[in-house]
Amino acid sequence: MTTQPSLLSQVEAGVAWITLNRTAQRNALDIPTLKNLHALLDAFNADPAVRVVVLTGSGRSFCAGADLAEWAEAEARGALETYGWTETAHALMTRLHSLDKPTIAAINGTAVGAGLVTV
């Protein structure tokens, strides 16, 4: 079984494209995806060749919000209090909304919960 990266990115003509790529989960945000997205935003913000950042989703959904399966696993381990999703998501949303470059949410389908907050 091969795994797909949770994010795809490319830069074309000054436009940085970031695609949420967890199609089977409707692009739900788990902690690794949140952290990787934050790192990509930092890199694109620092890149002088990038003039604008576009965030979109693969498949039929833009983003289903939090990955509730990951939340359930943390709760089953008794680790929900230290799980850190809310803090990690808040840091990402703050970064997304404070970029020095214009950002565009290319909403290609459902945007729910934290997926809607990215807009």
Predicted segments, located by residue:
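Conserved CoA-thioester-binding segment of acyl-CoA-metabolizing enzymes
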Residues: 1-58, 80, 94
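Short glycine- and Lys/Arg-enriched binding-loop motifs that mark or flank ligand-binding interfaces
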Residues: 17, 53-55, 61-62, 101, ...
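Hydrophobic/aromatic residues within transmembrane alpha-helices
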Residues: 18, 55, 67, 118-119
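Histidine-centered beta-alpha loop that forms part of the nucleotide-sugar donor binding/catalytic region
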Residues: 21, 66, 108
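Glycine-rich beta-to-alpha active-site loop
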Residues: 93-119
